[in-house]
Amino acid sequence: MLYKSPSDWNTSQSKSIMLFGMSGLGKTYISELLRNNGDWFHYSVDYRIGTRYMGEHIADNFKKEAMSNPFLAKLLQTDAIYISANMKFNDLSPLSTYLGKPGDPSKGGIPFKEYMRRQKLHRDAEINSMLDTVHFIQRAKSLYDYDKFVCDTSGSVVEIVNCDDQDDKVMKTLSQYVLPIWIEGTEEHTEELVKRFTKAPKPMYYSENFLIECWNNFLKEKNIPETQVDPNEFIVWGYRKLLENRLPRYRKIAENWGIILKASDVAKVKSADNFTSLISANLKG
């Protein structure tokens, strides 16, 4: 572990952390707080995925849709217009839109085969974006003179890490440069996340085997072909299963390489100093 004791953490001029856990429990809230009032460099993995690795795929998807409109198609073919994704730290909708949801095309769904292809692209992009953390730690220091760095991970980081392998490439590399911190929710948090997701379901990234299992079980349970699947119904149906599947693996990552902070404690944090003190209190040694 990068910081072996509260003393190591408190006395270190350079502090680098990696926040992970389910979306909605405070990763980005804390990252923005540290950036805005604590002189921390904020590295958003989702933003990196969408801009560096998936940007061309996203833009091509927009162009494909535009080409179905004769008016826009002519302008595109003559380079009269330019189409690209306007990705922002606080608005990653172009990335989510590209990932899509499988099911009935008339309800906004895409074929499952195409959905799987996009999922694989996202996996590669997320692995590369996570490993880019090392470069950005060095870049933040050499270019902008930041001694403090927060890696704001995607909720799906657990899907690209083998938590049972101490030599996992992503975690073995990153644990040399950052302190991994799992923000752990309660059953009440899980229920709130499910309720929130049900109201506004969004595309998700799944591990391949888990996704195929969920898809086949859904088709069997509903007794329908994939072209009749309501995309939102499937995404909502699988969300709780996804949470339950991820939670023990989040814990294993924290036990192997980092520490655990309770979401209820993180929610009380109002300043960078509050947060660094909370980390210190949860480091052993």
Language model regions located:
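NTP-dependent small-molecule kinase module
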Residues: 222-285
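The conserved Walker
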Residues: 23
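Hydrophobic anchor at the beta1->P-loop junction of P-loop NTPases
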Residues: 19
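Conserved phosphate-donor/acceptor-positioning beta-strand/loop module used by diverse small-molecule
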Residues: 152, 170-223
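Short beta-strand-centered segment that lines the nucleotide-binding/catalytic pocket of NTP-utilizing
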Residues: 39-54
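A conserved segment at the C-terminal end of the G1
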Residues: 28-41
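ATP-dependent small-molecule kinase phosphotransfer cores
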Residues: 54, 59-163
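Pre-Walker A adenine-sensing motif
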Residues: 1-11
